[in-house]
Curated annotation (Swiss-Prot):
Protein name stated in the entry: DNA-binding protein Fis
Source lineage: Bacteria, Pseudomonadati, Pseudomonadota, Gammaproteobacteria, Pasteurellales
Lipid biosynthesis among keywords: no
One of the Pfam families matching this protein, by short name: HTH_8
Annotated function: Activates ribosomal RNA transcription. Plays a direct role in upstream activation of rRNA promoters.
UniProt keyword list: Activator, DNA-binding, Transcription, Transcription regulation
The protein's assembly and partners: Homodimer.
Amino acid sequence: MLEQQRNPAEALIVSVLNSQSQVTNKPLRESVKQALKNYFAQLDGEDATDLYELVLSEVEHPMLDMVMQYTRGNQTRAALMLGVNRGTLRKKLKKYGMS
């Protein structure tokens, strides 16, 4: 019998290839943390600007792309899945050139 997941976010697992060429699964949040650590390390003491927008767009664009594929372009279904109204979805699709 399959166990039910307690938190839907637990389903957001990223497969990562580690240094020994082994695939490991880790939560999306851990991948975001690691990406930010790498980003900060590359700043070399410089200040970051628009970090929130940078991270949001890196996650939002592929999420919208996959949801639109899953719903076969049905914006009403996609908006329901995402928990946003259809007008908001349309604005986001336009922002990323997906309309």
